[in-house]
Amino acid sequence: MIYLHAIDPIAFSLGPVQVHWYGLMYLAAFFSAWALGRSRILRGRLPGVDMDGFSDLLFYGMLGVVLGGRIGYMLFYAFDTFLANPLILFKVWEGGMSFHGGLLGVLIACGLWTRRHRLHFFDVMDFVAPLVPLGLGFGRLGNFVGGELWGKFTQAGWGVIFPHAPELADWPPAQLQAQYAAGALDRFARHPSQLYEAALEGVVMFVVLWTFSMKPRARYAVSGLFALLYGVFRFIVEFVRVPDAPLGYLAFNWLTMGQILSLPLIGVGLVLLALSRRAPVLQPVVPAAAGVEAAK
């Protein structure tokens, strides 16, 4: 049944402060990463790192996600707007985050953390990779709740009518409800591409990566699988997702910026998987403190 999107993006208010679902999704993403990471730290899956060190790593990662995601969006998707008004970079409440920018931010932040702790960069990345997909899924759910990043038109029974889409943005809510009840809005239904990405980048990637990494794998393997899966899934979903308005299609009347940025990920993923065939396997070393905590 075609659904009319009518979700309030504001979860609740605390006096004058409005708490948005999108912000709560970020909290859920970071909490899931902490909970999953904690379980593996206690099992010694990142030798030499205790919970204090992991909390520090998570903080670095959070900064990388937020700063990299925002800067990446401005550079990849809204560069002209940024040049006209550089201060818009700090207006995060107006929306605009890029996964690829966030990924670069995380790589830089974790690289700094790794150098400080004198660990191999890809041992850390292999540890971090399985902690990420659930956060990606929560982020895409936030996009859906906010009614943004919608897909192309579809007549599939699971299509969603987004009132903020250009063709309906000027319609009064009462008129939308009346026309929807009469079945007159079905032609405006769109692919819920946010939910497709939540399922693929969130659920499927998490199940595959978490299961694959349950036993120690060769260095590069988990990171390579993450890059490959994300690149492929994002490239596929872009075919039913409306390209970002300022850019549109960049080539062949179908190639989007999201696909262009995903192609290098696919290549990097394949290279890392190839390198893993001759790489060492990092064996768990359970910290003494972790053993005591686990025993409790």
UniProtKB/Swiss-Prot annotation:
The keyword Transmembrane applies. One of its GO terms (biological process) is lipoprotein biosynthetic process. The keyword Transmembrane applies. GO terms for molecular function: phosphatidylglycerol-prolipoprotein diacylglyceryl transferase activity. A 1,2-diacyl-sn-glycero-3-phospho-(1'-sn-glycerol) binds at residue 140. Pathway: Protein modification; lipoprotein biosynthesis (diacylglyceryl transfer). Its EC number is 2.5.1.145. One of its GO terms (cellular component) is plasma membrane. The chain crosses the membrane at residues 10-30, 57-77, 92-112, 119-139, 194-214, 220-240, 255-275. It is found in: Cell inner membrane. It is a multi-pass membrane protein. Its main location: membrane. Keywords: Cell inner membrane, Cell membrane, Membrane, Transferase, Transmembrane, Transmembrane helix. Pfam families: LGT. InterPro entries: Lgt. HAMAP family: Lgt (MF_01147). Catalyzes the transfer of the diacylglyceryl group from phosphatidylglycerol to the sulfhydryl group of the N-terminal cysteine of a prolipoprotein, the first step in the formation of mature lipoproteins. This is Phosphatidylglycerol--prolipoprotein diacylglyceryl transferase.
